[in-house]
Curated annotation (Swiss-Prot):
Self-association state and partner proteins as the record states: Homodimer.
Reactions catalysed, as given in the entry: Hydrolyzes Xaa-Pro-|- bonds to release unblocked, N-terminal dipeptides from substrates including Ala-Pro-|-p-nitroanilide and (sequentially) Tyr-Pro-|-Phe-Pro-|-Gly-Pro-|-Ile
Entry keyword Transmembrane helix: no
InterPro entries, alphabetized: AB_hydrolase_fold, Galactose-bd-like_sf, Pept_S15_Xpro, PepX_N_dom, PepX_N_dom_sf, Xaa-Pro-like_dom, Xaa-Pro_dipept_C, Xaa-Pro_dipeptidyl-ppase/CocE
GO cellular component terms given for this protein: cytoplasm
Similarity comment: family membership: Belongs to the peptidase S15 family.
Official protein name in the record: Xaa-Pro dipeptidyl-peptidase
């Protein structure tokens, strides 16, 4: 374990003493440091009728227990404080450590003993993570140190778990959206699942916009998947044009219906544990699946601003600007009289994507988004540089396949009976509009590109993204964070994992940092919390996070690739082609072992290199035919210890998100020896070699200059490391599988790897 503490708010002595007193700690500025520490420790054992016994089970020195120390005349020293602090946080002498000083250095322990600062040290200790993954104060509250009185209690600028999660209100309302996405002449209704604690105070809301939460149709999804085996189409030379079109919602009328009291209820919904954490701290949770999902009406428009509007309508309702009904019969309306109107959206992948889309509307009431692994341009999710390009792990998927997965109205037999014919018509229109034949950018994709509206974002934004996420690739977050207005508060966490959540990782206090931010933004707490704009997980060692200033630098280093002419054959033998098509993982294994068709260049680094931004391959290339696709991957190659990309559980249920509520495992990325790590990758239809808007011809056997931008990253390579460049054509995970008999030739003498670099 190593501490990377971003959530602690430096506190004055007076404020620290006041907060400790509010928690029931009997500390006195006039007492000695030793007496105050003893009083603090005894309070920790509030479950015991007598603190003598548990105190005797701590050691103050290697040869003295804590009880004996406090009964002695010996003075409090750094050695004693450090040893006791470690034990209070759950570290066991002789098991987790033998030499405390060395262990503290390894931990990067954030508290440095000064006898005159003991009150502040105790305050800081309570806000510091235990070995279990919870802060000490959260651990104590979870054990019942504070009663669940359904009111707010704060410590170090963060809300504590004092809301009773055993008496939650669970209710359903149906919000009227200014939409008619299925064109049935009726405004669409949006189902909203609400979970909120009982409270006399207006509550802020965490809203998870999740098209998955009302169920998914995996059978329809699998039937809709596309075969990837097809020839690369030769496209006609042309220029693509699109236009920015404002989304115009339909008109709605003020509701004059009576207020209803009897709301639909529910017992369970698949919740997000970060939401659960805040539910216990006085934040209502709502789950909204939007148009075209079970319980709602309308068509699943998948990614456009009509879908975004269906979520926006819910924020409007929370602020009194939209109508909600008690049921589909629309006999009574219901108002959000429990809400303070301030909303933060949460969730990963599609969920985080909807958060970005919502933010670009500038809707009043949306105070903050926490968007994890979020898409900012749907074209860049399903296409790349004029190619159909499947997200990592999902060959054959496209946006209409996702529509089939999430149009959960068809899981309700009555809805299927009444609406499936119309749904199939609209789905067919969507399938045609996305143009899988060419892979080109068009108006359909432009209408699902949130980047063009990034200037309208006015809420605070928090993004998290994995630099090993080949599902929602790093370009998605790179482009949105660099398009954000300079006037807003923005924060970016870049981790070394894949498509995963990070709130329950051991090495970073993400949960607590979000608590401090949300108390600021949604509760109006003046806590003076400041979070860096960007925090990056160092790839060279375990559990090390660093503050960085920017994602993407303008300083570049050009690396020569060699002098040879390299030939890349596109064609595989029939058996090999079928085997790779059946299992793309077998293809990846062969590719990284140098066995698949490829041109390979190894670059031995003569100095450290901190990559920060978009690597570009500038290549001199020619094709034997009038078509060609180019794929590239950059590896950190050679055996050494590296971070894995999938977090593993260190404990099974040590994190309590309330008071014995929604427990979850503590996780972390492992640090193990392996043979390589993918740094970046990229794909291009050579007919789109200049830009997305220009379709060019490919002259047979004529040299072309190609600039292939790869996925942005931040990655630290050290002197002596090997940077491996792999150039090839068909990628059996991502691209169409064209097995035609053509070849590409690369002139390495006229080619470079252009690397954006930053100072370390």
């Amino acid at each position: 374990m190593r501490y990377n503490q971003f959530s602690y708010i430096p506190t004055s002595l007076e404020r620290a003493a006041e907060e400790l007193k509010e928690l029931g700690f009997d500390l006195d500025l006039q007492k000695t440091a030793k007496a105050n520490l003893e009083s603090f420790l005894r309070k920790l054992f509030f479950h015991y009728p007598d603190s003598v016994y548990p105190l005797s089970h701590l050691i103050a020195k290697n040869d003295m227990d804590a009880l004996s120390f406090f009964q002695s005349e010996q003075e409090l020293s750094k050695e004693v404080f450090d040893l006791l602090a470690l034990q209070v946080l759950g570290f066991i002498p002789g098991v987790d450590f033998t030499e405390a000083d060395a262990f503290l250095d390894k931990l990067a322990f954030p508290i440095h003993f000064d006898e005159t600062e003991i009150i502040k040290h105790i305050h800081h200790l309570l806000a510091t993570r235990c070995k279990s993954g919870m802060t000490l104060i959260d651990d104590l509250v979870s054990q019942g140190m504070l009663t669940m009185d359904n009111d707010y209690h704060f410590f170090n600028g963060k809300s504590l778990a004092t809301f009773d999660t055993s008496q939650l209100i669970r209710e359903v309302v149906y919000v009227e959206a200014p939409l008619d996405t299925d064109q049935d002449g009726q405004l669409d209704l949006i189902k909203v699942n609400i979970i909120r604690p009982q409270s006399q105070k207006p509550l802020p809301t965490l809203m998870t916009p999740s098209p998955y939460h009302q169920g998914i149709n995996e059978v329809a999804n699998d039937k809709k998947l596309y075969r990837m085996e097809k020839e690369l189409v030769v496209k006609k030379r042309r220029q693509i044009t699109v236009e920015d079109r404002d989304f115009i919602p339909l008109e709605t009328q003020p509701c004059k219906l009576p207020i209803g009291q009897n709301l639909e209820s529910f017992s369970y919904i698949n919740s997000y544990s970060l939401n659960d954490y805040f539910l216990a701290r006085g934040f209502a949770n709502i789950y909204v699946s939007g148009v075209g999902t079970a319980g709602s009406t309308g068509f699943m428009t998948s990614g456009d601003y009509a879908q975004i509007e269906s979520f926006k309508a819910v924020i409007d309702w929370l602020n009194g600007r939209a109508t909600a009904y008690t049921s589909h019969s629309k006999t009574h309306q219901v108002r959000a009289d429990w809400a303070n109107g301030l909303v933060c959206t949460t969730g990963k992948s599609y969920l985080g994507t909807m958060s970005t889309g919502l933010a670009t509307t500038g809707v009043d009431g949306l105070a903050m988004i926490i968007a994890e692994s979020a898409i900012s341009s749907w074209y860049n999710y399903y296409r790349e540089n004029g190619l159909v390009c499947s997200p990592g792990g999902y060959p054959g998927e496209d946006l209409d396949v996702l529509t089939e997965l999430t149009y959960s109205r068809n899981l309700l037999a009555g809805d299927y009976l009444r609406h499936n014919d119309r749904y199939q018509e609209l789905l067919n229109q969507q399938s045609q509009a996305l143009d899988r034949q060419s892979g080109d950018y068009n108006q359909f994709w432009h209408d699902r590109n949130y980047l063009k509206n990034a200037h309208q974002i006015k809420c605070d934004v928090v993004y998290t993204h994995g630099l090993q996420d080949w599902n929602v690739k790093p370009r998605q977050v790179y482009e949105i964070v660099n398009a954000l207005p300079s006037t807003i508060n923005k924060h970016l966490f870049l981790h070394q994992g894949e498509h995963v959540y990070m709130h329950n990782w051991q090495s970073i206090d993400f949960r607590e940092s979000m608590n401090a931010l949300l108390c600021q933004k949604l509760l109006g707490l003046a806590n003076d919390f400041s979070l860096p704009e960007m925090i990056w997980q160092d790839n060279t060692c375990p559990q090390n996070w660093q503050e960085r200033k920017v994602f993407g630098t303008s300083t570049i280093k050009e690396l020569d690739l060699g002098q040879e002419l390299l030939l890349i054959d596109n064609h595989y033998g029939e058996d090999e082609f079928k085997a790779y098509g059946k299992d793309f993982r077998a293809f990846k294994a062969a590719l990284f072992k140098g066995k698949a068709n490829q041109a390979l260049v190894d670059i031995l680094l003569e100095e450290d290199l901190l990559i920060n931004g978009e690597i570009v391959l500038q290549l001199k290339v020619k094709s034997s035919e009038n078509k060609g696709l180019l794929s590239a991957q950059i590896l950190d190659y050679g055996k050494k210890k590296r971070l894995g990309d999938l977090p593993i559980a260190l404990t099974q249920s040590s994190i309590d998100n309330g008071q014995n509520f929604s427990r979850e495992p503590l996780k972390e990325l492992p640090f193990r020896e392996n043979s390589y790590r993918v740094i970046s990758k990229g794909f291009m239809n050579l007919q789109n070699r200049n830009n997305l808007s220009s379709i060019e011809t490919i002259p047979n056997n004529k040299w072309m200059t190609v600039r292939l931008p790869l996925q942005p990253t931040i990655y630290h390579l050290e002197k002596g490391d090997t940077l491996r460049v792999i150039l090839y054509t068909t990628d059996f995970e991502h691209t169409v599988r064209d097995n035609s008999n053509y070849a590409l030739t690369i002139d390495l003498s006229q080619s470079q790897l252009i690397v954006p670099i930053a100072s370390n």
